[in-house]
Amino acid sequence: MFKRSLKVLLSNPPINRVKPSSTIIQPLSNTTTTTIINNNNITNFEKMTHKKSMTIDNICQNVRNAQYAVRGELVIRAEAISHQLQKQKTEGTKTLPFEEIVYCNIGNPQQLKQKPLTYFRQVVSLVECPDLLDNPYVEKIYPADVISRAKEILGSINNTTGAYSNSQGIGLVLRSVADFIERRDGHKSDPSEIFLTDGASVGVQRILKLLIKDRSDGILIPIPQYPLYSATIELYNGSQLGYLLNEEKGWSLEISQLEHSYNDAVSKGINPRALVIINPGNPTGQCLDRANMEEIVKFCLEKNVVLLADEVYQENVYVKESKPFISFKKVVKDMGGDYADLEMVSFHSVSKGFVGECGKRGGYMELNGVTQDVKAEIYKLASIGLCPNVIGQLVVDLMVRPPVAGEQSHDLYLKERDNIYESLKKRANLLTNALNNLEGVTCNPSEGAMYAFPQIRLPAKAVEYANSIGKAPDAYYCIQLLEATGICVVPGSGFGQKDGTWHFRTTFLPSEEAIEGVCKRIADFHQSFMNKYK
């Protein structure tokens, strides 16, 4: 090392005399070498110049091609503006016409100030810190049923949330989910057919991984659709087979569209493996009726495709009298015969409904008609991830087994649940009515879920300008909305839409106190935008 460093020093003589103290000597020529002389010890550091192993061109191109609009360009820009607002606040300046970003891009209730359910948080706090149960004041702070539930849960997990559970999930929670499904549907549910997951998304990803070998395997997805599906299909190198929902008929699902998409795929040599149904719809907010669901089940059996039932919004139904939520599990079992054994996977989550615990990442999937050898492969996929997070599993348990009549926490739980539900229903109507009052905008009622998906008829000049700068017209509209109002929504082009139409998706999750202001800001911006491009 000494000889090598000395050679470098001689080939790059210093300009100034070297002092005994540490001195950095810059070489005369423009080389990659810097020599440091420290107390007469010569060492050498060379800047390594080598070709990078990972480049944007040689990484998996499916990753590059996958798009997830819900957290795409608009959200990245919104976060940048949020930092700017924080800086403004610190410096006492004001350069933007708004004071905060309103994130209406994603169904994330607690981000927009929905309060968590008291019972859930009380139980989780005791489970996370079991020493509290030994505190002499615990019974004065926590209701008796909360203490009892926490002890029951702790007994099922060896008194700690810090250990891995079984890859399929905690036995206590699996049994609770099965009991919930039986109460809901009136049909038997087997805990061994249930897998707990980190939110419904992980379950969806695992099943799609199981189904897709290559581009010759296709998945039928609704258009518009939740981009989890399109992104995951692309990641796994499958083919997206879109079927159009009918906007003119309240985003209805027509079997003729399924037939068209199926036949088109087969003609191209693609094998449709599964049909995705999102009920209630995301981003469209429609609810299916039983007759339509039975048609879908018949289609799946006839075509031999797996039914993937995304039912995470089953508690978000605002037309319960005319279109109550019915699970596909109930439909196939009620139909009986071969239909009862239809290959199907149903998904549910703690992120939606009135629970809104998105950050806890809890969910489950139930298998129906799946063979034991295939189920073993699903278990293998779960095992590769070790286990779902334990707190998420416990929140699933609380969701499917809340306090019952006679328990101390029951009345407060009902009050909080009903207040959230009624408020969501009110906000859904308020937002859709406000959107329908805008020039060139039509919006179907939000029968369920957490979103409105209005169609916006943009002036020709706006469309031309957006195209000239390489933006989808609805994306350009949404960017301008964000820049002018601080309201972050998602362009319809991120979900898929009928050619020649433009939409955006917005949640109605801002609080009742805030939603009217959001509606007014959208209305003011929209009128200004339309006037500018007329």
UniProtKB/Swiss-Prot annotation:
Keywords: Aminotransferase, Mitochondrion, Pyridoxal phosphate, Transferase, Transit peptide. Its EC number is 2.6.1.2. It is found in: Mitochondrion matrix. It catalyses: L-alanine + 2-oxoglutarate = pyruvate + L-glutamate. Residues 1-18 form a transit peptide. GO terms for biological process: biosynthetic process; L-alanine catabolic process. The modification N6-(pyridoxal phosphate)lysine is found at K352. Its main location: mitochondrion. GO terms for molecular function: L-alanine:2-oxoglutarate aminotransferase activity; pyridoxal phosphate binding. CDD domains: AAT_like. Pathway: Amino-acid degradation; L-alanine degradation via transaminase pathway; pyruvate from L-alanine: step 1/1. One of its GO terms (cellular component) is mitochondrial matrix. The keyword Nuclease does not apply. Homodimer. This is Probable alanine aminotransferase, mitochondrial. It comes from Dictyostelium discoideum (Social amoeba). The gene is gpt.
